[in-house]
């Protein structure tokens, strides 16, 4: 079964076994500041289970008699050990079990985490299924091996949090969406998409320690006003990450925006007058985030969803095939390769235009910065030696970042393919606060199954998205 949703992490694993290692002497961020560790053993970008998913121990073989249920309002979970059920919503609950198996386990009840079933309110008992605002706090008391879990709204033993964004309601059908019994379930497709795009925020463990105070309510920041004084506290959907680290790679480099614009060749667009005069129009898929402006207190990190309401009509046709997962989003087919069992530092994304008459129809390949050994610090990509790359002229004055010759493309049916002399360029001229960073690329993949549009006459490079 799909037991976790991988996403760009910061070296800390949550529910998977992948942990990257950066052999550089610098460039890894810790609580928003560049590490000065010279030992060369800092963790590199890898995958963390910070989204939506489900983990559980398999209780018996499929089709066996060991079938359990979580209650009358929750669907049955064949072969799953309910005592070890770990539900991951990313926005209010996770089960971080200590390695010793004794202390610090989050015993938040299933109904409290999902909003399913009957829960009390000031006006009496009401059904709050699918309403995150109605989730109850749970208090855990331990005496030896005995654990008592009770709902509470105050105290020192809270295991989930009140100060979550009030406007996030991923789906009104949490139990069905989380059951994973129907791989084409529309609600589950919504949860996948929201998790993968980072629209479900995560809780910040600022200390990085696994103790009773690992999640402080004061560290969960959602407003731009709170962000302005210290960006390391940001936990808005566009930047959701664990351990207080800011990871804007999703938006800054791999951001998907509905904005249309133009490229003037290698020199970029806008204020640059030294590039080619040949202007090429580019279009971007209508999913992604708009960065908050640094000079506006009212600016927010906004989810861009033009014409999309996250309904079954907009997000559907979810198909799991081998290690790949794909679903339809508007006019795009979104495919995540190596999704179910991702290797360290790799998760491929293809965006394929579904309109055969679209002259810009193409497949785009996405991969996290672990591939080219970049790390991130407050919106700036850092090279293996901690140097800033891309936005300020790049390494050695170049306006692009050249990947190692060992950069690999992976195709599920054909194995590994080497793409020689690949170059991802980050245009310094086009970067400005408050706007999604363009993906300026001279990518020339040799594999014919990874098509990119040919450059026009006089066009030195092109924005892909």
Swiss-Prot record:
Comp. bias (Basic and acidic residues): 135-144
Residue spans of biased composition, Polar residues class: 38-48, 145-156
Disulfide-bond pairs as recorded: none
Biased composition (Low complexity): 21-37, 111-131, 157-167
Region span, Disordered: 9-48, 59-78, 93-167
Family that this chain belongs to: Belongs to the adhesin P1 family.
Name under which the protein is recorded: Putative adhesin P1-like protein MPN_286
Organism: Mycoplasma pneumoniae (strain ATCC 29342 / M129 / Subtype 1) (Mycoplasmoides pneumoniae)
């Amino acid at each position: 079964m799909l037991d976790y949703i991988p996403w760009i992490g910061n070296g800390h694993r949550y529910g998977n076994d992948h942990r990257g290692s950066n052999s550089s002497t610098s460039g890894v961020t810790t609580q928003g500041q560049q590490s000065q560790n010279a030992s060369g053993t800092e963790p590199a970008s890898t995958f963390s289970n910070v989204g939506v998913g489900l983990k559980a121990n398999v209780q018996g073989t499929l089709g066996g008699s060991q079938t359990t249920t979580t209650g009358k309002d929750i669907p049955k979970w064949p072969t799953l050990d309910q005592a070890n059920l770990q539900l991951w919503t990313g926005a209010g609950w996770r089960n971080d079990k200590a390695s010793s198996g004794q202390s610090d386990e989050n015993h938040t009840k299933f109904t409290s985490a999902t909003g399913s079933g009957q829960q009390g309110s000031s006006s009496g008992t009401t059904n709050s299924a699918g309403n995150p605002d109605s989730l109850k706090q749970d208090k855990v008391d331990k005496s030896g091996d005995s654990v008592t879990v009770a709902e509470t709204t105050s105290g020192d033993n809270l295991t989930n949090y009140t100060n979550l964004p009030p406007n996030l309601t991923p789906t009104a059908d949490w139990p069905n969406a989380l059951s994973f019994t129907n791989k084409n379930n529309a609600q589950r497709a919504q949860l996948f998409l929201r998790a993968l795009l980072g629209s479900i925020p995560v809780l910040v463990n600022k200390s990085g320690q696994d103790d009773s105070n690992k999640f402080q309510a004061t560290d969960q920041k959602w407003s731009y006003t709170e962000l302005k004084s210290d960006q390391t506290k940001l936990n808005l959907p566009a930047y959701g990450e664990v351990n207080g680290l800011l990871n804007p790679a999703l938006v800054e480099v791999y951001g998907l925006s509905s904005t249309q614009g133009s490229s003037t060749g290698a020199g970029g667009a806008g204020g640059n007058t030294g590039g080619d005069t040949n202007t090429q129009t580019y279009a971007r898929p209508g999913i992604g985030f708009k960065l908050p402006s640094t000079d506006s207190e009212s600016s927010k990190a906004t989810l861009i969803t033009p014409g999309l309401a996250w309904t079954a009509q907009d997000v559907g046709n979810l198909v799991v095939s081998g290690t790949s997962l794909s679903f339809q989003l508007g006019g795009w087919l979104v495919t995540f390769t190596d999704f179910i069992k991702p290797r360290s530092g790799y998760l491929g994304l293809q965006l394929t235009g579904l309109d055969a008459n679209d002259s810009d129809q193409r497949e785009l390949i996405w991969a996290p910065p672990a591939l080219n050994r970049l790390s991130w610090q407050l919106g700036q990509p850092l090279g293996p030696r901690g140097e800033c790359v891309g936005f300020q002229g790049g390494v050695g004055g170049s306006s692009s970042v050249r990947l190692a010759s060992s950069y690999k493309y992976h195709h599920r049916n054909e194995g590994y393919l080497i793409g020689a002399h690949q170059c991802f360029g980050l245009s310094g001229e086009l970067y400005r606060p408050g706007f999604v960073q363009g993906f300026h690329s001279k990518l020339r993949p040799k594999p014919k199954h990874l098509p990119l549009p040919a450059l026009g006459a006089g066009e030195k490079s092109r924005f892909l998205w």
